[in-house]
Amino acid sequence: MDLRLLGIDNTPLFHTLHHMMEAAGEDSVNAPSKIYVRDAKAMAATPADVKEYPNSYVFVVDMPGLKSGDIKVQVEEDNVLLISGERKREEEKEGAKFIRMERRVGKFMRKFSLPENANTDAISAVCQDGVLTVTVQKLPPPEPKKPKTIEVKVA
């Protein structure tokens, strides 16, 4: 099936999945690789809200139970914002055992294509009360070009 017909060929998830499928090689076209499955689960398990303001873009991601050292925010090539990290399983204390374990553990990742007017030198990230807020400032709009007057000389 050609995913371009669905209109999802220009999304970060599509590009990530396409890259992983190419990297897997032609020997395993019919079976997804462990890396593909791991990364797809990591992206699906990390929902995010993205807001646009007049001067910035704001990414809000739920990160319950994580410390700032467990979260990594990076800008990759081609203006791609990468939010990743790992939720670690709580160590069992002696004499205690889990009856039920429902909280997610493992690696997580989200990639977002930033617009051309995103200022990748002005990014801040704050994690408070289990919510990560990444703010990307916008570049100022380019000033309109003023007409240049060229002096005409008499020959």
From Swiss-Prot:
Cellular component annotations (GO), alphabetically ordered = cytoplasm
- This protein's major location comes to cytoplasm
List, alphabetically, the Pfam families matched: HSP20 (PF00011)
Spell out the subcellular localization from the entry: Cytoplasm
Keyword annotations of the record:
Cytoplasm, Stress response
Indicate whether Ion transport appears among the record's keywords: no
Give the UniProt family note: Belongs to the small heat shock protein (HSP20) family.
This protein is called 17.3 kDa class II heat shock protein
Q: Write down the species.
A: Solanum peruvianum (Peruvian tomato)
